[in-house]
């Protein structure tokens, strides 16, 4: 599968306004033009480019790229902040389900400020904060010319780190809590990888709705500290993978009902154990596979317990809802209300400069990382 | 889980009409009463009873049981024919999801004729053909007193073997083809265990609707003969498990689209391979686990291909629709139309007498059995 839409649209936009230069080789949102004389105040940008797949910190380079003129339906944006997500790393490694043509700029998420708008743009104005509607923008850069239709505004009264990390993890958490089971206050959700970006958002969004969460994490040196942090966020129970497999789990179900929904970011045994604790007719939704093992489902759970096994990919959801701006708008508004109310915080972040990318990428690859690397431009 | 409804209802009915004798020990539909003087023409029956779980042919015994009086809401029926299904064997072995209290009469499916009706029965009349609405009747017997509400009529113009085998396998096939994906003529369904009772019904019902079927069977001595038989029934393609795993499968998809629906009666590798051939967004529905191995689903199939993994159990469907007679009636009517049109035949059956039960049970346990054992009373 090749990355469609954003990058190819940009190239099409560019082609209508000027001669084709070597931009055709750069498809991943990084549109540059050494031959074109732009009227924009910002004529170039610094970006984290990769020309080959491989070890993330090795294949990425910091480069200066020229920007094209701002076409009638485009905007010039200054990037404010952009995180390193696990899917970005998989893209660099060449193992993700969608891969841009190379060379490409890394990063699929982030918040930017509009600096200049094309003549026909009605939806955005200078100063607006925007995030990409879809993956494929190439967000690890200081500035970009983007099609206005590929962006959606965010209010400027939320923290910049919340804005930069809103479009992937909290949206994934929100949709998984909304689209698979009808959950109401008092219901229970169980999840593994509870310390991931998605996991933390699940805890907070569920808590805001009065939904119990049983949160499974791997045993680790700072277990108590992490457990306390998740509990402070609103987690009902925090348990280790080992506890998940023990008979004493039944004690836990004296204080909350068996879960209707299980969220799986791990796979393997962990997923099978989540399933085991589900209510009859409940759903297991997989959004990640950290353990690199498949999801194994006993036949009896399917036939006699009617468990439903599904997957979720926020990129696909955004594409399926590409022409329904209301659905995306409604979700972002709800999440921003939670952020303003102090009920949904950004994950703990380490802010890094673009030039420190090698260390940031290496840190993002380490196991048991409890902080998200975010480029701040 | 204990068998509810039918048997316990019968006992409740009996209790309103006469003294309680040792019938309380027989909960599995087999209601008998040595102390009661019945006004029915038929006062007792012969039944295949089991008092312990174990090897089917060893634990079953042929016994004579007295029948209770026909209560106001009950009917006396003469059993005409009743098959041995895999789930019946699992019940005898004690490995099924629902198990009756022992002693119990074996068998959960079959067709009977009404011989006498209670005063308050409006839905049935003498001479009607009836089948049970739910599992738990104990059908391997010559006669029974049953609650009218637990029975549904079938037209008498279909073959008795079709009637005796309609309620489980064809109903399972019909619902799986109806409830999980919206299938239209030209779509494809893939299934393993294509030679099972359910598999044969799937082939015929799908063919009647113009739906392609890809039918996977195990390699065996009479492969060609079996393949020809399934093709004559309407199978689009018949392949072996080995072929299912080979690259030449893509040749097959030149003549029919990739399946929206995969039906799994096997589990293990076979189920994973069915999944691999599904369309994006398609469903794998498991109704059996002949291989005694779980269903293993790659994480990427869930996240990036949005495959949906579900289970189906016709007994649960019947219970969920217990108070919606229309749903059951509509399905049976549709199936009877197919039977009359020569589009849905009973599986190849071996008719046996109740007294030959040991040999019948042994035959039903053999692998690669291509004929269903049916008791004819």
From Swiss-Prot, chains A, B:
Residue numbers annotated as active site: 96 (proton donor)
The EC number(s) this enzyme carries: 1.3.1.104
Transmembrane segments: none
Main location: mitochondrion
Reactions listed under catalytic activity: a 2,3-saturated acyl-[ACP] + NADP(+) = a (2E)-enoyl-[ACP] + NADPH + H(+)
Transit peptide residues according to the UniProt entry: 1-52
Locations listed in the record: Mitochondrion
Binding site for NADP(+): 169, 195-198, 218-220, 287-290, 312-314, 372
CDD domains named in the record: ETR
Protein purpose: Catalyzes the NADPH-dependent reduction of trans-2-enoyl thioesters in mitochondrial fatty acid synthesis (fatty acid synthesis type II). Fatty acid chain elongation in mitochondria uses acyl carrier protein (ACP) as an acyl group carrier, but the enzyme accepts both ACP and CoA thioesters as substrates in vitro. May provide the octanoyl chain used for lipoic acid biosynthesis, regulating protein lipoylation and mitochondrial respiratory activity. Involved in iron homeostasis; affecting Fe-S cluster assembly and ceramide metabolism.
Protein name, entry field: Enoyl-[acyl-carrier-protein] reductase, mitochondrial
Organism of this sequence: Danio rerio (Zebrafish)
Source lineage: Eukaryota, Metazoa, Chordata, Craniata, Vertebrata
């Amino acid at each position: 599968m090749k990355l469609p839409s954003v990058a190819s649209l940009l190239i099409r936009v560019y082609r209508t306004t000027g001669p084709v230069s070597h931009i055709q080789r750069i498809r991943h949102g990084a549109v540059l033009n050494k031959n074109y004389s732009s009227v924009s105040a910002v004529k170039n940008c610094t970006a984290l480019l990769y020309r080959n797949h491989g070890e993330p910190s090795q294949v990425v380079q910091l480069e200066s790229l020229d920007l094209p003129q701002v076409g009638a339906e485009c905007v010039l944006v200054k990037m404010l902040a952009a995180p390193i997500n696990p899917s970005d790393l998989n893209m660099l490694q060449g193992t993700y389900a969608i891969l841009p043509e190379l060379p490409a700029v890394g990063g699929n998420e982030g918040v930017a400020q509009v600096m200049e708008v094309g003549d026909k743009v009605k939806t955005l104005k200078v100063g607006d904060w925007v995030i990409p509607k879809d993956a494929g923008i190439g967000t690890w850069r200081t500035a970009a010319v983007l099609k206005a239709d590929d962006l959606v505004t965010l209010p400027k009264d939320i923290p910049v780190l919340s804005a930069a990390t809103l479009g992937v993890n909290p949206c994934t958490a929100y949709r998984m809590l909304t689209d698979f089971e009808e959950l109401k206050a008092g219901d229970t959700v169980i999840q593994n990888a509870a310390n991931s970006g998605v996991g933390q958002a699940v805890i907070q969004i569920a808590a805001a709705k009065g939904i119990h969460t049983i949160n499974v994490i791997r045993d680790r040196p700072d277990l108590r500290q992490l457990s306390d942090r998740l509990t402070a966020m609103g987690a009902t129970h925090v348990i280790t993978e080992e506890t998940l497999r023990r008979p004493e789990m039944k004690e836990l179900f004296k204080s909350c009902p068996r879960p209707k929904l299980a969220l799986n970011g791990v796979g393997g045994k962990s997923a099978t154990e989540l399933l085991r604790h589900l209510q009859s007719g409940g759903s297991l939704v997989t959004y990640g596979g950290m353990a690199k093992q498949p999801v194994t489902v006993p036949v009896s759970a399917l036939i006699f317990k009617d468990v439903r096994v599904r997957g979720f990919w926020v990129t696909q959801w955004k594409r399926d809802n590409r022409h329904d701006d209301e659905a995306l708008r409604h979700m972002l508004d709800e999440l921003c209300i939670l952020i303003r109310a102090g009920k949904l915080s950004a994950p703990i972040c380490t802010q890094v400069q673009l030039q420190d990318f090698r260390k940031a990428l290496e840190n993002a690859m380490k196991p048991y990382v409890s902080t998200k690397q975010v480029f701040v431009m």
